[in-house]
């Protein structure tokens, strides 16, 4: 296993483990998701540079666009949750009360 592949997979797994174990606050879950998306962006950008293909060079930009949309939707949910419930604790949220 190459060191670059190991670093990308370990960074992605670190974000995934943080998302699985730190599910008490919405902000920490959003930060773990952003770390995972950043790892995927760097991996796809490196992959498209190694291939020297023009057809795969647009994939990192598409991934970055989806990451920005995910971040804006997550921050909107965070603001709405903190205004309505007073905190970002995920244990206080109930979908039946919305």
Swiss-Prot record:
List residues traversing the bilayer: 1-21, 26-46, 58-78
Classify the protein's membrane topology as the record does: Multi-pass membrane protein
Listed InterPro entries: NADH_UbQ_OxRdtase_chain4L/K, NUOK/Mnh_C1-like
Give the location in the cell: Mitochondrion membrane
Catalytic activity of the protein: a ubiquinone + NADH + 5 H(+)(in) = a ubiquinol + NAD(+) + 4 H(+)(out)
| Presence of keyword DNA-binding | no
What is a GO molecular function of this protein?
NADH dehydrogenase (ubiquinone) activity
Name one process (GO BP) from the record.
Answer: ATP synthesis coupled electron transport
Q: Name one GO cellular component term.
A: respiratory chain complex I
Which of UniProt's keywords are assigned here?
Electron transport, Membrane, Mitochondrion, NAD, Respiratory chain, Translocase, Transmembrane, Transmembrane helix, Transport, Ubiquinone
Translocase as a keyword? yes
EC code(s) of this entry: 7.1.1.2
Name the enzyme's class: translocase
Family assignment from sequence similarity: Belongs to the complex I subunit 4L family.
The record's function comment reads:
Core subunit of the mitochondrial membrane respiratory chain NADH dehydrogenase (Complex I) which catalyzes electron transfer from NADH through the respiratory chain, using ubiquinone as an electron acceptor. Part of the enzyme membrane arm which is embedded in the lipid bilayer and involved in proton translocation.
Name the chain's protein. NADH-ubiquinone oxidoreductase chain 4L
Q: Which organism is it from?
A: Scyliorhinus canicula
